């Protein structure tokens, strides 16, 4: 991962996992992910609402047999996709939700940052098989490998990975 940001590397790793479609709405908390999509073969579909992104990812997974992938911003982006995640969990549908989150040094401090949730990971854990936050670039690839391994070897369902905006920009 020489000159690529974590966000760009994430898109590259998704391609290596066979992801060909991502659903989501670009926002300030996911801009680094979208920089990576520009040079990727992954097709991006923009819904009108993050809940739509979740249900599109769910439908894609049901129709294709491959995990559906969605990018969402922190706060309202994540809360809007929770209903689709809960349905995917109950119906055993493989879905990977990648969300941005505020800077790592602000997490859990309730400082009132844009779209800050007091416990975003705790919220996502209730509607997913597991939720993980990436604090260092080297944590990204193992997290994605774990997600795709679990999709293939365990009862499927949604998995949530969140990446702070400052970590997304790291090389």
Regions found by a protein language model. Name each.
Residues 1-171:
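N-terminal alpha/beta PP-like core and its mobile active-site loop of ThDP/TPP-dependent enzymes
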């Amino acid at each position: 991962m020489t000159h690529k940001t974590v966000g760009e590397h994430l898109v590259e790793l998704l391609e290596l996992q066979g992801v060909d479609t991502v659903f989501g709405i670009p926002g300030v908390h996911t801009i680094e992910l979208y920089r990576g999509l520009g040079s990727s073969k992954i097709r991006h579909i923009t819904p009108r609402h993050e809940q739509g992104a979740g249900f599109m990812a769910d439908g894609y997974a049901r129709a294709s047999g491959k995990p559906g992938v969605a990018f969402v911003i922190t706060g309202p982006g994540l809360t809007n996709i929770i209903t689709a995640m809960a349905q995917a969990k109950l119906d055993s549908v493989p879905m990977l939700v990648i969300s941005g989150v505020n800077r790592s040094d602000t997490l859990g401090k309730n400082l009132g940052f844009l779209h800050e949730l007091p416990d975003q990971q705790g919220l996502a854990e209730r509607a997913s098989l597991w939720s993980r936050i990436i604090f260092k670039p080297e944590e990204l690839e193992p997290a994605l490998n774990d997600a795709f391994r679990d999709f293939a070897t365990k009862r499927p369902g949604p998995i949530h990975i969140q990446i702070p905006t400052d970590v997304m920009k790291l090389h």
